[in-house]
Amino acid sequence: MIPRLRIGNQTAIACAERMEPFEFALRHGFGAFEWFADKKEYPGGSAAGWDESDMDQGLRAWIRDTGEAHDIRFTVHAPWQANPLHPDGVPLLIRSVDFARDIGADLVNLHLNMAEGAPGFVRSLEPVIRYAAESGLRLSIENTPRTTPADFNQTFASLRELDAVGPGTVGMCLDLGHANLCTPTHNDFIRYIDELAPEVPIIHLHVHENYGDADSHLTLFTGPARIDDAGVRAFLERLRRRDYHGALILEQWPRPPQLLIEAATRLRELLSLSSPGRVDGGPRIEWRRFFDARV
């Protein structure tokens, strides 16, 4: 099977109707979609967003069947509170794994937390790794603005020492906007990527922009890349070097949502136009084989 890079979008707490972003993905033929359990409850009983308790078995089955019918790769983003270092973190992650299994998702994503160092994080995550593997799922660990390339190099070195981690079980979710905000690589997300050890497997992508001032989650090509897309081109080249195949999630719900279509279309153009020449003496590889022919 030819590996494909699937562009998709994500649920959004800003939507009054939680299914609106998914319906948008279906309508526009996206190849991936991420379910982010980001429910927030307010004083007075009102709430925004959703969590797994809002998705009964009937709805989960419908999501799974719809994804299969439309050839959409699902991923699940665990709640931001799902920190395995906290007492309630592992149960939240297990709940996300169960939801992911029920809808036929590929992986569950969570944030790296270095409060107890790489060994402490890996130890706390071990039961979730085992449970995910038994459920046929992978875990992706996402960089936050506070976590550095060195943190990921250390974390994956610790993971390699863990018997529970089989090949391909755990990888990194590279968040481009967070990499741009990280202090050691501020406003230089390409440097962030280049400082990741080759042994750190990138298996998932969150893509958004900022100006280095805040985690603003600007749609791709509406921030700095609107004027100069050299950084995006360099990012795509790094993906090619790593032989990346998987989802690329546009992690925002802009107004108008049409900006997502424009970003996906522009990415498609860059992937098609990228030079197929050699990189570091490597073989000649056509970019098109990395890209899902749909938007």
Regions found by a protein language model. Name each.
Residues S46-A48, L85-G89, P119-V122, T183-H186, ...:
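Short, solvent-exposed loop/turn segments at secondary-structure boundaries
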Residues T11-C15, A37-E41, A78-A82, L112-E116, ...:
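Active-site-proximal loop/turn and secondary-structure-junction residues that shape catalytic pockets
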Residues M1-I7, C15, M19-L26, D98, ...:
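Histidine-acidic metal/acid-base catalytic patches
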Residues S53-H70, R95, S124-Y131, S158-E161, ...:
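Catalytic-core regions built around general acid/base machinery
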